[in-house]
Amino acid sequence: MKFPEIYSATGMMELIQQIGFLPLLDSGIEGFSAEDIVAEDCGYVRLPEGGWDWPLWKWKGEIVQEMPCMYGKFFNKKAGFISQEWWPDFCNYRRSKYPRPDEESIEGAILCTLQSTGSLITRELRAACGFTGKGMRSKFDSYLTRLEMATYIVTEDFIYPRDKHNHKYGWGWSLLNTPEDLYGREACQCNRTPEESYQRIFKHLKEILPDASDIQIIKLIG
């Protein structure tokens, strides 16, 4: 499938709705990422006066909020989008591989904290879970990534600091939540077996990525 060149957040939303799955950056499959299909002037650029501009990066919050869709580190520990149509199957398969963590485990404690507090930006959740010492940030991020890969945590939105002129700046912080809290338990329920969900996803990805090898697609599904 040849993907259209994308010039706007609206165009990206339409494509995600059409194909169901879209990694943000390099996916390991040539041409299959949001970065690959945006128009050249929507890519990352350094500004002459300092700073940077990256329209694609700024679209993420709009896409997640307005579609809506799921966003998180779903693809080989890298971020991407999944439409609500395909989320139940993806969730069904991934959770069969990664059962809900025990509440006594670190990952279980992180998930319970987020469920009890509601949405939190990453640093707030990290502090609430006691990961405040030296070197704790990277350790905490690895636990978060595992929970995102397992579909228990997603990004609800992106929060940006503002300068004295009330302009947003920086890379932004992920506002984290559980998919159940955002869209209800039914959004994560599927009437197929995990194997049936896997085969359905595999067949779909083969259709939209005819040049990708089976190994590449298997790696993408996880």
Specify the residue positions occupied by each region the protein language model found.
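Long, low-complexity intrinsically disordered regions
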Residues: M1-G222
